[in-house]
C-alpha cells in the first residue's frame, strides 16, 4: 500500500514541476494529533514527530532519537531514516525544487529547512489528499468552559489583547494557534482525538471587534452565548471576501503558528508585524482559581495512582 502511494505521489511531480515533495507531521492547525495524519498515510510512521521528503529516486524520513527504531520497523523498507537535526539547512540534496502545501509550513520553517540549498514551490492542492483523502472529520460544536473553572472572563482577556495591539501601534492581531483562541474565548472543541482544542482562528482589532474564522456549524453555540456576533463568524471559504471588506492597517502575526498560506494572504491586505502571539505568555501566568484547580487535579491524580498501586 505504501509503495503504491509513493508511486502515485511521484507520478504527480512532472505535472507540478517539482523534484520532490515535503510532508510534515502537523496539519493545517499545526497539531501533532490531527485526524489528518498525512505522514502516516505516505510512510506508515505512527510517531508523534516526524517529517518526510519524497524525491524521485529517494525517500527520507526525519525522526528524533525517540523514534529511530520504530521508524526503521514501520518505514525502513521504503525510507531512509535520518536524524531530525539534519533537517536544518538540509544538504542531503541540492539545487532541487521541493513542492509543499503552504498551509502546513511557516515561512521561518521554510527558510530554516529548504532555502539554503534548494528552492520551494507552493502547491495549492495537498498532493497526499489527491491520492488518499479518507480522513474522518469531526463536526461537533465548540463549547464554553464553566465560569467556575476559568477564573477570568473572555472580556477581561480581550482587554489585555487590545492593550497589546495598541502598545505595538497596530490595528489587528491574527491569532493562528487554535489553543490560543481556546484560551482567549474560554472554549474547547472535539476536533482532535486526544486534545480538546477547537480548530479555528481569530482576528481581533483595536476597536474590540473579534472575528472567528471557523466552520459555521461548529461555532453556533458561541453565537447563542453572544461570545461571537453572527456577522463576525467567518467561514474559511469566505475569507477572501471578508478581508476585502475590512479596513487596511497593520496586523500582528505569530511567527510560530501562522502558515505561509495565511501570511501571503494577509500581506495582500495589511502591513505585517511578525511577532510572537502575546497569548503564549499571558496564559502561562495562572490566576488563583487555575492554581487551585491544578492543585486539586494533582491530588485526584495522586489518589488514583495510590489506588492503582
Residue ranges and their predicted role:
Residues 96, 222-277:
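Conserved catalytic alpha/beta cores of large enzymes that bind or transform nucleotide phosphates
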Residues 306-309:
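C-terminal helix-coil-helix/basic helical segment that borders enzyme active sites and/or dimer interfaces
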